[in-house]
């Protein structure tokens, strides 16, 4: 991997971690409004774990995540996830507006990286020999 690719990977990872952290803060603020707006808090209950996984996955692999949520392991999957999180987040406060903007922009950046032929592969995208489908690691022969 060339030096430019390493700088690009570091930048993309920093962007994803920052976006995930700000989105997590935005969903925490949205969750705190459970008394005034229940549906916003319900959306935050779904968005919070998805945004926490965006950050956590950049530092450490999650067991079985690749089998059940393989969209975390491609640029297009992360782009769609970030656009979904942006739609789930109601931009009412400062953190929520920042998170909405960052999620929306990062979603389009990830989609552009998926369509680019020279996009570097992130270390968190590596398969490490695990199967991508449920039960594919078992070698059962049917007779």
Curated annotation (Swiss-Prot):
It comes from the Eukaryota. It is a multi-pass membrane protein. GO terms for cellular component: Golgi membrane. One of its GO terms (biological process) is vesicle-mediated transport. The chain crosses the membrane at residues 14-34, 37-57, 69-88, 94-116. Keywords: Golgi apparatus, Membrane, Transmembrane, Transmembrane helix. It is found in: Golgi apparatus membrane. Its main location: Golgi. It holds the Pfam family COPI_assoc. Golgi membrane protein involved in vesicular trafficking. Belongs to the TVP15 family. Present with 4540 molecules/cell in log phase SD medium. This is Golgi apparatus membrane protein TVP15. The lineage of its organism: Eukaryota, Fungi, Dikarya, Ascomycota, Saccharomycotina. The gene is TVP15.
